[in-house]
Amino acid sequence: MSKLDELIKELCPNGVEYKKLGAVADVSRGGNFQKKDYISNGFPCIHYGQIYTTLGLFVYKPLTYITEEKASKQKKAQPGDVIMAVTSENIEDVCKCVAWLGNTEIAVSGHSAIIHSSLDTKYLVYYFRSSMFYSQKLKLVHGTKVIEVTPDKLNDIVIPIP
C-alpha cells in the first residue's frame, strides 16, 4: 500500500472519488523556445531541462527570460499551473513537474506539458511524485534512448480527488 493509499484510508475512511485527469484539468503542450534564446532580462520562462536540474517542487520566481517577441509566440502557464517535463533520458525523470506559484504568466518550453486545474496545485505536484502515479506513468512511456509521455495521454491518468 502506498503512502497516498494509507492517507486516504486514514483520513477518508469512506474513500474518495477517483477521476481521470482530463476531467479535472486541461493538459496542453509547451512552446518551442530553446536555451539559446535566454536573455538577461525580459519575459519569464521555464525550460523543461530546469525541472530536472535546477528547480524544486514549487517555483515562485523565474530563473531565465526570453525576449517579449519570442514570448508572444510561446505557450504560457498561469500562476497555479503545473509544468511537467514529458521527455527525458530515463523513466524516473520523465513527468517530473513543478508548481508555478509566481504572480505572472510564464513561457514554457517544448518537451513540457502545462496542466491547468481547479485542484490544489501543491496536491497535484505531490500526486505526480507518488507511486500511484508512477505505476500509471509506466503504461504511457515510449521510446528507448529518449523516453517520452505524450501530453494527451496524461488525460487518462486516474487521480484521487481530495
Short names for language-model regions:
Residues 22-35, 49-81:
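Sequence-specific dsDNA recognition surfaces
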Residues 15-19, 124, 155-162:
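Amphipathic alpha-helical segments
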Residues 3, 7-30:
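Non-catalytic DNA-recognition/assembly elements of restriction-modification systems
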Residues 16-24, 43, 77, 81-83, ...:
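Short, structured motif recognition centered on aromatic/hydrophobic residues
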Residues 105-112, 119, 142-162:
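A short glycine-rich beta-alpha junction/loop motif
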Residues 47, 62, 68-129:
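A short beta-sheet element
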Residues 4-5, 15, 32-33, 53, ...:
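Short loop/beta submotifs within extracellular cysteine-rich repeat domains
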Residues 10-12, 32-33, 70-71, 101, ...:
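Short, solvent-exposed loop/turn positions at domain surfaces
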